[in-house]
């Protein structure tokens, strides 16, 4: 009475992954055990210092030019000829005033250049031009 009808000469083409899993688990255990030892093993008591908190950063003035060419300072619409005096007053209050200039991409470059010139004439040297990524 024969139970098997297959040829006994066939080659087994499957890979035995059990030894691979065993090795990987051993490596995992080794890394888990040694990982805490990799931290600084020299105990050092660092000295405490008395430091002053850094000064608060003031919000910058935001000069905006919309698609229609209207000029805004911190969301308040102003006339272009008043920009320089408005910024000079802000410079008088805070010598370290920062200005962020943002303009719609459809705005004429000449308007942006005029706004930059007004910012420069007001004595403001910290200017950032805001763009989208």
From Swiss-Prot:
GO terms for cellular component: plasma membrane. InterPro entries: ExbD. Residues 38-133 are periplasmic. It is a single-pass type II membrane protein. The accessory proteins ExbB and ExbD seem to form a complex with TonB. Belongs to the ExbD/TolR family. This is Biopolymer transport protein ExbD. Involved in the TonB-dependent energy-dependent transport of various receptor-bound substrates. GO terms for molecular function: transmembrane transporter activity. Gene3D superfamilies: 3.30.420.270. The gene is exbD. It is found in: Cell inner membrane. Keywords: Cell inner membrane, Cell membrane, Membrane, Protein transport, Transmembrane, Transmembrane helix, Transport. Residues 1-16 are cytoplasmic. Its main location: membrane. The chain crosses the membrane at residues 17-37. Signal peptide: none annotated. One of its GO terms (biological process) is protein transport. The lineage of its organism: Bacteria, Pseudomonadati, Pseudomonadota, Gammaproteobacteria, Pseudomonadales. Pfam families: ExbD.
